[in-house]
């Protein structure tokens, strides 16, 4: 009851302290107006008090805003240069990154075999993505997931695509999958494979058999990534280099051509 009263007061304060809601914004000063708009979507989606409170508490992520408001910061690696992309992304040489992928597969061979048997996505692809996203679980991100997701969805250039993920992030808070303060990527990515919240809701699976799908379980996250690729047309046993059907499927994971080429480049060199 006390939480309900506090939430009601907080929401009322939010409504009274800002002008009319805004569907999307291009100025940081209007972030409160966007939160009002999003609150309407959140309540319509049936998200409860914990999720609504997380929205009240969410601040604008400066890291996310700077990245989204400056498109030139999102470039810098020439097309068709996957080795350079791997080095820039991983902080080591492409050759060393590929060696680390092989080592990670060797240490988790049973897990990868089980996932490939079920979904048809090879270990080389999954372990490459895992390494690129979080250095195999070594760094899961430093931005509060809710703040990153809400900031990204507020920006007018991004909101049609990313607002559903912001709502999903608040639903994950409401369900207890993450907390209001759980940290991840600057776009609201979470867990070992840095799923966007809406994608986790859609494709997250229980890979380790403990009865729940957990993005912070490496096995669950890997199985869920395989499920996402297979659900979007991955063809087991087929090549995945540029020009193939499977290469096109990689775009559902990340729409950057540089990223897709880097996955294919590394995974092809990792081998079986």
Stretches with model-predicted labels:
Residues 156-181, 185-189, 193-194:
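Phosphate/pyrophosphate-binding betaalpha-module
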Residues 1-155, 171-177, 198-272:
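Cell-wall glycan-active module
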């Amino acid at each position: 009851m006390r939480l309900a009263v506090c939430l009601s007061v907080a929401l009322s304060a939010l409504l009274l302290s800002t002008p009319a809601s805004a569907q999307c914004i291009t100025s940081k000063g209007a972030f409160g107006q966007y939160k009002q708009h999003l609150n309407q979507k959140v309540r319509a989606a049936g998200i409860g008090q914990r999720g609504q409170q997380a929205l009240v508490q969410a601040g604008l992520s400066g890291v996310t805003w700077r990245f989204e408001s400056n498109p030139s910061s999102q470039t810098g690696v020439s097309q068709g240069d996957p080795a350079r992309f791997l080095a820039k992304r991983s902080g080591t040489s492409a050759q060393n990154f590929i060696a680390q992928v092989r080592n990670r597969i060797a240490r988790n061979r049973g897990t990868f075999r089980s996932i490939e048997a079920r979904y048809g996505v090879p270990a080389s692809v999954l372990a490459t993505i895992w390494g690129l996203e979080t250095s195999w679980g070594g760094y899961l991100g430093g931005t509060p997931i809710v703040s990153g997701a809400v900031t990204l969805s507020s920006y007018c250039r991004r909101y049609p695509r990313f607002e559903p993920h912001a709502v999903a992030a608040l639903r994950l808070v409401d369900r207890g999958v993450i907390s209001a303060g759980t940290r991840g990527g600057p776009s609201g990515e979470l867990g070992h494979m840095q799923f966007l919240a809406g994608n986790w809701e859609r494709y997250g699976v229980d890979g380790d058999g403990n009865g729940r799908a957990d993005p912070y379980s490496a096995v669950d996250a890997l199985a869920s990534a395989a499920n996402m690729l297979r659900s979007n047309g991955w063809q087991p046993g087929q090549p995945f280099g540029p020009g193939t059907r499977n290469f096109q499927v990689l775009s559902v994971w990340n729409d950057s051509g540089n990223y897709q080429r880097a996955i294919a480049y590394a995974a092809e060199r990792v081998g079986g």
